[in-house]
């Protein structure tokens, strides 16, 4: 499955500086059995009404609850949650 986390930051001007630390944090998800790919994308359009960052994960369906309960996921919420205005979570079959 593909798991997408699409984020609109409270301050979009910070998105570029957040890409590297978010990528580093999410690289820990490779330690979860069944996660095969993780990529972090920065929005490339300058419009204010766009989301800023998209995190894409490819995983086996059984890995999703493990990811949700992981320390990495808790760190994501704790460290970056206050910077997020809104987010969309989307799952798709591969």
Q: What would you call each of these model-derived segments?
A:
Residues 2-8, 41-70:
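Short, well-ordered beta-strand segments in beta-rich or mixed alpha/beta enzyme
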Residues 4, 21-24:
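Non-catalytic alpha-helical scaffold/packing segments enriched in small hydrophobic residues
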Residues 7, 12-15, 29, 38:
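Compositionally biased, intrinsically disordered low-complexity regions
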Residues 13-17, 49, 75:
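Residues that form or flank phosphate/diphosphate-binding pockets in enzymes
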Residues 13-19, 63-67:
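Short, conserved charged micro-motifs
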Residues 23-26, 41-43:
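A generic local structural motif
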Residues 24, 30-34, 58-90:
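An amphipathic, aromatic/His-enriched active-site/gating alpha helix that lines ligand/cofactor pockets
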Residues 39-51, 77-94:
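Glycine-rich beta-strand-turn "strand-cap" elements at beta-sheet edges
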């Amino acid at each position: 499955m593909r798991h997408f986390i699409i984020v609109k930051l409270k301050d979009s001007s910070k998105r570029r500086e957040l890409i590297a630390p978010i990528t580093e944090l999410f690289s820990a998800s490779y330690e979860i059995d069944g996660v095969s790919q993780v990529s972090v994308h920065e929005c490339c359009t300058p419009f204010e009404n766009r989301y800023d960052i998209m995190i894409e994960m490819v995983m086996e369906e059984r890995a999703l609850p493990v990811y949700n309960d992981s320390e990495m996921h808790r760190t994501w919420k704790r460290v970056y949650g206050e910077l997020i205005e809104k987010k969309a979570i989307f799952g798709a079959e591969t």
